[in-house]
């Protein structure tokens, strides 16, 4: 039976159904529902998303087609076997049949090619019984013919007439002798005749059985070979299916890992390790909690910026407790098939309970636990609900099932609030940006296996790396090692150039010819040198390797190549700005030291006096007077982390995003305390509020006020702000407890201008000044009365450009080049081009503003 022309048959599905049936998974009877569900499970990529009923109907159609084809194939084999048997019987027939018998046989057996297979099969079975009676009639007919021959002769007496024609129907013989006298022939059925008849039939049956047995043996041998090949093919198919299922099961299950990391490998987090040790007591002594009847904590949430050591701490916990760890990345749990993500979570927690005591570590857990009220898909909500259920089920398990769940994320605020309640991730450990002391301990931990000089200064290197986390310091060590190798190879190459040419080795000229043309620039020279190092396969000798070590200069060179990840998060590294780079402003410097540096350097005295919350400082004054430079110098001198926030960059067009940005800034500072937050152009963030205004700026001001002095205390978080217009800032932000101290950074007086000029020119050495230049005279010039520090910097730069322009013109005219210096004439030319950035009108306004702030 073939499918109708209008019925579509999926050939791939048909082949897979045949493969499934041949694997003997279904037994003797086939249930199409089970067959369809198994196919959807095995081939989830192709059929996983199809509806069950529709797919089951399609499988039923394919199964009916396969069944009909199998029946037709079996019927064809039966017919071919019967025809082959009849052909062999005709060849081995030892009896001669009469003309009538031949005619009857020709009539009885139709052409198998033209007959219907079913009809021909039935007719062959029907003729089988008839052929036995026909084959036994010749003796009886011969005997009858011999007795009747004299009676049926012609009157002429020589030629005999034809024997009477007989027809057989169903074993009965009918005499159809034409015309004349009919003789009634006696039907003699005596014992002799019956015995002879039985003997003839038995002989014929034995012949047929012997032929059938030989035919069966031949077919059995051929069929045995075919069955053997078929069995081998089925075994191969079963092996492939089993391997595929095992591979899928292995990919779905999470392997247990044994961690070799200890707490001693985690440097610079002593306070964090102390807190973690208190939380892990129940993993060592569960009998205490069981005796007290208290459910031990099950979840720990590690959060902090990227690279701060969350994954390392999780492995250190597993290694310190000597427990296996089930590590899984959160995106691996998410699946495209509905319900499979939840199943993976259930299997993960079931595996953890069966392997208890153990630790489950879910990295980047925020990928599967967003806030359900803002989740865009139902699948995300179901995953969160499933994780909550699994966490609650751990509390219902007996206390002997010691399972600790650790989650790590960079964005704890994006997690669903239900996940952070008691009984789930009730313990949160914050890993912030390490301070200078923590960086020193991290460097000592990372450099334990490195070859360093004995007098290596870790403190100085830690001072040069503000904003670096553990991953950045590891990258710094790797880059410093590369710099050390490069330095040694360069030294070796320089020594080889000085040595005479060794016999058998190519000279430097040959190497340059092999490398290409001679370098025409410094970049090409460096490239050729590096190519020479790559192609040089001579290993370093033990003498050269003996003195090889990573020096402090290698780390300093590597600092230019490594960009800390915290810098992308808003942290600014300012290692080069010190008090020496700021001329004058002595009184403001003392105020900043007392407000920011004193609480860090003298915490005990501040606690004794009851000085808790650090005061915020507002730097006000005209632009270009050094407000930002002061903030950088404070952060550098104190060794604190530094977050620079530009006012306009926090504003966002979407409702709630600006407030969230302000909240994230303070949260980052708390995680990295002690830390300095510097708000540049704070007037853009905190404009004066009015009764009619209810826009985004009002919400930002309210959020900023709450973060500065709200219910949550900000310990070791110092606030610096700078503005050119303190008069337009909201008055609420200037009250005590927030930005309660305002320092006015005004235009420098003549004495301060002298100090600023000396700082800019490095006491007349850079740029080199001529003997006729007097910095005090320039600073006391009336044209400098409205100059700010930025204007004085522009004046020195313009004077240097005038000197360079004069030197270039002299070289064009062929005049001998002399020593390049900046003279008084160049400063006079610069005065003509550089104008003060603060006009007299603005100066009057700032003086009035200064008087109002001092009252």
From Swiss-Prot:
Crosslink position(s): Glycyl lysine isopeptide (Lys-Gly) (interchain with G-Cter in SUMO2): 207
UniProt-annotated stretches for the region Interaction with RPL5: 1-219
Record's subcellular location: Nucleus, Nucleolus; Nucleus, Nucleoplasm
Region (Disordered), start-end ranges: 83-234, 496-523
GO function terms (MF aspect): ATP binding; ATP hydrolysis activity; preribosome binding
Motif (Nuclear localization signal): 85-88, 217-231
Gene Ontology, cellular component aspect: nuclear exosome (RNase complex); nucleolus; nucleoplasm; nucleus; telomerase holoenzyme complex
Residues where Phosphoserine is found: 133, 190, 210, 214
Short motif Nucleolar localization signal, span: 49-52
Biased composition (Acidic residues): 90-110
Chief place of localization: nucleus
Any GO BP: rRNA processing
Protein name, per record: Nuclear valosin-containing protein-like
Gene: Nvl
């Amino acid at each position: 039976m073939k499918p109708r022309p209008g019925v579509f048959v999926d050939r791939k599905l048909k082949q897979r159904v045949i493969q499934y049936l041949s694997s003997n998974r279904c037994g003797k009877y086939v249930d199409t529902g089970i067959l369809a569900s198994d196919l959807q499970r095995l081939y989830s990529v192709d059929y996983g998303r199809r509806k069950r009923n529709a797919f089951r109907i399609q499988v039923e159609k394919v199964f009916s087609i396969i069944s009909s084809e199998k029946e037709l194939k079996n019927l064809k084999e039966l017919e071919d076997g019967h025809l082959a048997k009849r052909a062999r019987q005709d060849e081995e027939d030892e009896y001669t049949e009469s003309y009538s018998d031949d005619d009857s046989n020709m009539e009885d057996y139709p052409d198998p090619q033209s007959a219907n297979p079913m009809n021909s099969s039935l007719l062959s079975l029907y003729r089988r019984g008839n052929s036995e009676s026909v084959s036994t009639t010749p003796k009886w007919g011969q005997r009858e013919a011999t007795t009747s021959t004299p009676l049926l002769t012609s009157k002429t007496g020589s030629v005999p007439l034809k024997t009477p024609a007989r027809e057989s129907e169903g074993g009965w013989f009918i005499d159809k002798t034409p015309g004349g006298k009919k003789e009634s022939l006696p039907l003699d059925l005596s014992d002799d005749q019956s015995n002879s008849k039985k003997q003839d039939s038995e002989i014929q049956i034995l012949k047929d059985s012997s032929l059938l047995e030989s035919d069966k043996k031949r077919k059995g041998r051929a069929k045995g070979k075919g069955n053997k090949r078929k069995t081998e093919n089925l075994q191969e198919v079963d092996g492939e299916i089993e391997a595929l299922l095992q591979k899928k099961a292995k990919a779905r299950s999470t392997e247990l890992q044994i961690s070799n990391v200890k707490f001693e490998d985690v440097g610079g987090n002593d306070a964090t390790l102390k807190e973690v040790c208190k939380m892990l007591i129940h993993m060592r002594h569960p009998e205490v909690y069981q005796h007290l009847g208290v459910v031990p904590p099950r979840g720990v949430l590690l959060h902090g910026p990227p690279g701060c050591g969350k994954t390392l701490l999780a492995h250190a916990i597993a290694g310190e407790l000597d427990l296996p760890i089930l590590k899984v990345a959160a995106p691996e749990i998410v699946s495209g098939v509905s319900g499979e993500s939840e199943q993976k979570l259930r299997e993960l927690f079931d595996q953890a309970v069966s392997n208890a005591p153990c630790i489950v570590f879910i990295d980047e857990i925020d990928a599967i636990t967003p806030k359900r009220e803002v989740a865009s898909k139902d699948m995300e909500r179901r995953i969160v609900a499933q994780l909550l259920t699994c966490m609650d089920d751990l509390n219902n398990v007996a206390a002997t099932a010691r399972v600790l769940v650790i989650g790590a994320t960079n964005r704890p605020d994006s997690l669903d609030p239900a996940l952070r309640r008691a009984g789930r991730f009730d313990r949160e450990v914050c890993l912030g940006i390490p301070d200078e002391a923590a960086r020193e301990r991290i460097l000592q931990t990372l450099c334990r296996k490195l070859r360093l000089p004995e007098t290596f200064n870790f403190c100085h290197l830690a001072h040069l790396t503000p904003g670096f986390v553990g991953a950045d310091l590891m990258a710094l060590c790797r880059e410093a090692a590369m710099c050390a190798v490069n330095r040694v190879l360069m030294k070796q190459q320089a020594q080889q150039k000085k040595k005479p040419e060794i016999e058998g080795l190519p000279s430097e000229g040959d190497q340059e010819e092999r490398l290409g043309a001679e370098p025409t620039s410094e970049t090409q020279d460096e490239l050729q040198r590096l190519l020479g190092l790559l192609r040089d396969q001579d290993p370093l000798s033990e003498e050269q390797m003996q003195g090889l070590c990573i020096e402090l200069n290698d780390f300093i060179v590597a600092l230019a190549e490594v960009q800390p990840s915290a810098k992308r998060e808003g942290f600014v590294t300012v290692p080069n700005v010190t008090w020496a780079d700021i001329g004058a402003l002595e009184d403001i410097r003392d105020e900043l030291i007392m407000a920011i540096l004193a609480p860090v350097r003298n915490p005990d005295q501040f606690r004794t006096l009851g000085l808790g919350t650090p005061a915020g400082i507002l730097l006000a004054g005209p632009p270009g007077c050094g407000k930002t430079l002061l903030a950088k110098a404070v952060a550098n001198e104190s060794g604190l982390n530094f977050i620079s926030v530009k006012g306009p960059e926090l504003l966002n067009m979407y409702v709630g995003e600006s407030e969230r940005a302000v909240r994230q800034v303070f949260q980052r500072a708390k995680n990295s305390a002690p830390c300095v937050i510097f708000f540049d152009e704070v007037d853009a963030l905190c404009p004066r509020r009015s009764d009619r205004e209810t826009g985004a700026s009002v919400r930002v001001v309210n959020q900023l006020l709450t973060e500065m002095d709200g219910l949550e205390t900000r310990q070791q978080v110092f606030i610096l702000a700078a503005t050119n217009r303190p008069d337009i800032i909201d008055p609420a932000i200037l009250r005590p407890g927030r930005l309660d101290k305002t320092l006015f950074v005004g235009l420098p007086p003549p004495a301060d201008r002298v100090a600023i000029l000396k700082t800019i020119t490095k006491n007349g050495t850079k740029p080199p000044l001529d003997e006729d230049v007097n910095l005090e005279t320039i600073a006391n010039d009336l044209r400098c009365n409205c100059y700010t520090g930025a204007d004085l910097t522009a004046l020195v730069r313009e004077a240097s450009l005038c000197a360079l322009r004069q030197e270039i013109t002299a070289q064009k005219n062929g005049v001998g080049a002399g020593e390049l210096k900046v003279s008084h004439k160049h400063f006079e030319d610069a005065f003509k081009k550089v104008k003060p950035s603060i006009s007299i009108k603005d100066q009057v306004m700032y003086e009035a503003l200064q008087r109002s702030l001092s009252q």
